[in-house]
Amino acid sequence: MSMPATSTKTTKLATSLIDEYALLGWRAMLTEVNLSPKPGLVDRINCGAHKDMALEDFHRSALAIQGWLPRFIEFGACSAEMAPEAVLHGLRPIGMACEGDMFRATAGVNTHKGSIFSLGLLCAAIGRLLQLNQPVTPTTVCSTAASFCRGLTDRELRTNNSRLTAGQRLYQQLGLTGARGEAEAGYPLVINHALPHYLTLLDQGLDPELALLDTLLLLMATNGDTNVASRGGEGGLRWLQREAQTLLQKGGIRTPTDLDYLRQFDRECIERNLSPGGSADLLILTWFLAQI
């Protein structure tokens, strides 16, 4: 399909650099979905708490999204002179078109809608920073993405409409701000918790997959995951957070033997129909930011 125009301004970014970041985004999505075993999530072992999607759907979806990530970067570069609050409006048509390709690739299954939002923001932030000759670091990328989202939670969640979206309902009932709140705050769960935790485990020589699984547990224990709350209510969310925290307190995932705990956790999540998709999205960002 035809791609939305980004801007009338030109970008000075090299195509090879843009493609390099887009490739990292694709690899981040594949790394997350292939990671196994993940409680309640689609992985190489099973489909978790999902009956409508499988591993191959995520592979097709990631490939479709990869083709759009350069457009997010280019728009971030071309809009570098705009006020940051104005950037999000220009990103929306790119995100919607990307989402359309995702649904076509998966025959209508929502595999990566959250990642289109979050990776799209980070890619646009990278484009802006590169265009302005500013350092591209996890902190600068997330703070720039946050500047794009200033006021987003207030605009989209604090509403008194009679027909509430799922996100608005969870905000009003439980105070959960979900992906919008995390983005507007500059991804603090990633920057302050998941990313340093993951990098520390790698520095200690832990196997990268075990380190990522342990980091996923950390996110599940701390994230107010709206995916979980929409399926299991506040009780389901608190149960999942408590179980993840208990595993971390017992030592987390440090050896292949510890994977037995995750397999049991996975079975319990499937029985309760709980899937921590929001934490999975944040794990994608964690891996992505660890590479830059």
Swiss-Prot record:
InterPro entries: CitG, TriPribosyl-deP-CoA_syn_CitG. It catalyses: 3'-dephospho-CoA + ATP = 2'-(5''-triphospho-alpha-D-ribosyl)-3'-dephospho-CoA + adenine. It holds the Pfam family CitG. Its EC number is 2.4.2.52. One of its GO terms (molecular function) is ATP binding. The keyword ATP-binding applies. The keyword tRNA processing does not apply. Signal peptide: none annotated. It comes from the Bacteria. GO terms for biological process: prosthetic group biosynthetic process. Transmembrane segments: none annotated. Keywords: ATP-binding, Nucleotide-binding, Transferase. Belongs to the CitG/MdcB family. This is Probable 2-(5''-triphosphoribosyl)-3'-dephosphocoenzyme-A synthase.
